[in-house]
Amino acid sequence: MSAVWKLAFALAFIVASATSALGDRPQKNVEQELVKAAGSRDNLTSSDFHGFALYAAEVDGVIYRVAVPEQPAAGKPWVWRARFWGHQSEFDVQMLKRGWHVCYCDVGGLFGSDAAVERWDRFYKFAHETLGLHRQPFLEGMSRGGLIVMRWAARYPLQVSGIYVDNAVMDFRSWPGATYEDRKGSGKGSAASWKQCLEAYGLTEAEALRFQHGPLNHLEGLAEQRVPIFTLINEADDVVPPAENSDLLVSRYRELGGPVTERRRPDLGHHPHGLADPSSLVRFALASLER
């Protein structure tokens, strides 16, 4: 073979390799699959999320968001965030830097109800089966996001690597209901959100006060699978009082033998959420895949 032909073959190989690598880019795959799911490229938007590609699409009337790392980590692990996308995102950014995807499926106004769980079921199928993400996402729930995180996890304990709940609602009677076990709760509550919550669950107020299917009622499966839970608790929280929410999660989960890590901040109210230095949470999430 002449030197000219050898050079031509070498150049062709380089071009083909580059084209193949371009086609395998995680960003390109996510973009294409979201367009398919949404049914039209008009339903897709792309933007920058702290230096990473972020794609959002409306799928059957529901907003999906997927932030994509430059190079996915082995097994394509992912953080599944509930509510308040982009708020106090230090942890999310650190996980993206480590090759994790960060995903979101909007369940606003559903307060972790069965309709919210079913919506998350559909997103999980998309993320795991279509995008090929890990079968066990790491769940992240701030404030009212704790309701969907814990209710979905309780239903599917084998499909969860670990859980991070941040000043999180564990009982909708406490927030937004401002009631607790047939008595006035210690939090502020929200009349408008309480009405919306009752509608989402299809309950009267009397039925809601007797409801026994919240996150605190179904921890056994998670404990049996030893799913690790990281709790951030601002002890002066008068919106989502720890005594009616996070404290009960910690005590009940420990009684069941479940592994739980507490991070307490004694002088803070419901805000701020998140950790300015999320290194301890990052280590916790990374370890959750190795158990």
Q: Language-model segments: which ranges?
A:
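Alpha/beta-hydrolase fold nucleophile elbow
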Residues: 131-143
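C-terminal catalytic histidine-bearing segment of alpha/beta-hydrolase fold enzymes
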Residues: 67, 239, 243-291
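N-terminal cap/lid segment of alpha/beta-hydrolase-fold proteins
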Residues: 29-74
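The feature captures the conserved acid-bearing segment of alpha/beta-hydrolase catalytic domains
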Residues: 185-247, 251
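Glycine-rich nucleophile elbow surrounding the catalytic serine of serine-hydrolase chemistry
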Residues: 141-151
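Alpha/beta-hydrolase active-site loop
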Residues: 111-132
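Hydrolase active-site cap/lid region
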Residues: 151-205
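Short amphipathic alpha-helix adjacent to the substrate-entry channel of hydrolases
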Residues: 87-103
